[in-house]
A protein has these predicted regions:
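FMN-binding flavodoxin-like domain, especially the glycine-rich phosphate-binding loop
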Residues: 2-29, 39-133
């Protein structure tokens, strides 16, 4: 059974997003298809954010970022992990991304995580965020 109010948003990391969605009983949605109505109608999000070199969001995520700022996020819970990017190079930008979501009313759930780093453990991260989504 899918938890309709949780949406896992991904770009090129569909397999990881679907695994997280399965663990949460949520829906996985491509960043290319997320729209303002879905953002307004959902209560919680897991964002699988991607960065290009020099700490820039990928074009699809940049567009989604604008969508997430076009509507109020008040009361919405958002967990963020970086699937493409370098923790050393992108950490400040990723933290700023989270801060901007908070400025728009979102509550950031859990710690910002980077897939593929030594401390990354998908199961542990999902267990940590799931009670708060």
């Amino acid at each position: 059974m899918k938890h309709e109010s949780i949406v896992v948003v991904y770009d090129s990391c569909q397999a990881i997003a679907e695994e997280i969605a399965d663990k949460l009983g949520a829906e996985a949605v491509s960043v290319q298809s997320i729209n303002n109505r879905q953002i307004e109608n959902s209560q919680s999000f897991v964002l699988a954010v991607e960065f290009q070199s020099a700490g820039q969001l990928t074009p699809h995520w940049l567009y989604a970022y604008l969508n997430f700022h076009a509507v109020s996020l008040k009361g919405k819970k958002i967990a963020v992990f970086v699937t493409l990017g370098n923790k050393h190079d992108d950490d400040c930008v990723a933290k700023e991304f989270c801060e901007k979501l908070k400025e728009n009313g979102a509550h950031i759930v859990g710690e910002l995580q980077y897939a593929g780093t030594p401390e990354w453990n998908l199961d542990n991260w999902v267990c940590a965020i799931s009670p708060n989504l």
